[in-house]
Amino acid sequence: MKALVADRMRALFAVLGLMLILFVALPLLRTATASSPGVLWQTLLEEEVRDSILLTFYTSLVATCVAFISGVPLAYLLARTDFPGKRLIEGIIDVPIVVPHSAAGIALLMVFGRRMLLGKAFGLLGIKFVSAVPGIVVVMLFVSLSFLVNAAREGFEAVDPRLERVARTLGASPWWAFWRISFPLAWRSILSGMILMWARGLSEFGAVVIIAYHPMVAPVLLYERFESFGLRYSRPVATLMILICLVTFVVLRVIAGRERKEEA
C-alpha cells in the first residue's frame, strides 16, 4: 500500500514537473524552428547582427571577469568572516536581483551619466559610459554579479575551515592556503556562478537600453527590429540568439560536469 501511494505521488510530481518543462521548452522550440536555415544564415551574414551578437558575448564576458576579480575575494570574506554589517552587505549584493532593471538603468545613469561625478571623472580619462561599451559592461556587472558572489560564497562555506588552519599551522601563508586549498575546493561553485552570471548578462535589456541604446547588443537589436518591422523581421534574430546561447550554455555545462567527475 505504501509503495502504491509513493508511486502515485511520484506520478503526480512527474506530471506537474512535465507541465513546467513544456511551459519553458515549447516557446523555445517553436521559435527555434520558425525560421529556415537559409533565412538564419542570411541573417547571420548581416554585419549589424554579427556585431551585436559579438558585442553581447564580449561585454558579458568582461563583466564576468571583473566580477571574478572583485567578487571572489568578497565571497571569501563573507564565508569566512563575521563582522558588523555583514547581513547588510549580503542584502546589498542581492538587491540587483529584485530591483526592476529599468530602475537599475536609471540608478546607474545617476552615477555614471555624463554630468554625474563618476561620469565626469572617467570622462577626463577618455572613458564614457552613456552610449558606449563600458556602460554596457557596467550594466551587466550590476544586474548579474549576485549570481557569482552568492555561488562563490556557498562554495567557500562548503570548504571545512579546519583545512586552512592545518595548513597555517604547518607554515603556509594565508595566500598559499587560499590558492592551494580553499579556491580549488570551491572552484566548481565559482565556475557555476560565472556561467550563470555570463548567461544572465547576455539576456539583459531593460537597464542596457537606458544606459547604452547604441552600440546595440543583441536584445536591443531584437527589440528595435520588432518595433520597427514586426515579428517576421525580428524572428530570425531571436532564433539565432536562442540557438547560440543554448549551444554555448550546454557546452559550458558539459565542461563543468567533466571537471566535477575528474575531481570526484
Describe the role of every protein-language-model region.
Residues 2-38, 47-157, 181, 185-205, ...:
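Membrane-water interface segments at the C-terminal ends of transmembrane alpha-helices
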Residues 95, 163-170, 234:
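Short hydrophobic faces within alpha-helices
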Residues 153-164, 174:
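Membrane-helix/interface signature in polytopic inner-membrane proteins
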Residues 166-167, 177, 181, 222:
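Hydrophobic positions on the alpha-helical face of helix-turn-helix-like DNA-binding modules
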Residues 170-171, 184:
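Glycine/proline-centered hinge or cleavage motifs at structural transition points of membrane proteins
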